[in-house]
Amino acid sequence: MMSVRLMLVVAVWLCLRVDASQDVMKNLSMNFAKPLEDCKKEMDLPDSVTTDFYNFWKEGYEFTNRHTGCAILCLSSKLELLDQEMKLHHGKAQEFAKKHGADDAMAKQLVDMIHGCSQSTPDATDDPCMKALNVAKCFKAKIHELNWAPSMELVVGEVLAEV
């Protein structure tokens, strides 16, 4: 009887952790994308970039447009998440994650995932936008593996609430 209770407590805790993680990822995504319109104007990016961001967490949605990678770089720069070499600044990225709901462990895990994706994707030295796009694809896959991707209903609800 005690082991059944323990299993139930663990199962409930894991479900709450996943829901909390999805909520944090929703907050991070919404705040990361706030300067998107500025980046689109500054870089003359097409509306397809907005579509990619809108569908970013949708499972099975493939984004291949290098302009989306350029937008990711622009957003990261505007949010001061990059160092002088245009690489992720781990400390600032962890602070950004914590500011938007992640605890220390989750913030570190997110930055470690992005760093791992950056290391595992081939360098496109002649095209930093494609490198950013490939890192984003890898990161998205890792978030889905953890079941941390926010539901589309949550994201759409937030977007509609801000309009």
Curated annotation (Swiss-Prot):
At the top level, the lineage of the source is Eukaryota
Q: Which residues cross the membrane?
A: none
Tissue pattern of expression reads: Antenna.
Pfam families hit by this protein: PBP_GOBP
- Keyword check for Transport, yes or no: yes
Q: Which cysteines are joined by disulfide bonds?
A: C39-C74, C70-C129, C117-C138
One GO biological process term is: response to pheromone
Write down the InterPro entries for this protein, in alphabetical order.
Answer: Odorant/phero-bd_Lep, PBP/GOBP, PBP_GOBP_sf
Looking up SUPFAM superfamilies in the UniProt record yields:
Insect pheromone/odorant-binding proteins (SSF47565)
Function, as annotated, reads: This major soluble protein in olfactory sensilla of male moths might serve to solubilize the extremely hydrophobic pheromone molecules and to transport pheromone through the aqueous lymph to receptors located on olfactory cilia.
Q: What is this protein called?
A: Pheromone-binding protein
**What is the organism of origin for this protein?**
Heliothis virescens (Tobacco budworm moth)
